Amino acid sequence: KMIDAIIKRDEELKTRPISAIVVAPGCLPKAFPKEDGASMVRVEMAYGKCYAALALGRDSSLVKVRHEESPSFTSFLIKTSGGKLFPEGGGMQIRDSDGEVIGAIGVTGDTETVDQELALHGIRSAGLKTDADFEGKGRKFAIRRTKAEDGR
């Protein structure tokens, strides 16, 4: 359902051809279509965004900010993950109504902003939640933001 909604929205926005992937906890792929015309390694890039989101417990766009602030930190994580972690926006954790992380979604193919919008659209279309829905709801759901992420 999430992937279908993403592809439909992608067609409405007339974006570049995309790849999207939904993974279970542990980053086990569940669905990963690649639109005709999407360039090589798009599925791997979308997977890397999911990996980043699950590995650090935050949207991959925030992992990108962390990478810009401290390249040595994320370089270590990229190396430790065997190159699986991709610190670019478009990967989001998927949460159920209780806030439990039940997987992640990654989208790639257009701008970071569009990829992020499509990932969010997919999650919302399935009636599921994101990290943002649980901000300020206690330590279990806490996402500690850096100064740059807070806009300070």
Spell out what each predicted region is.
Residues 1-152:
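Flexible, solvent-exposed loop/hinge segments and secondary-structure transition points
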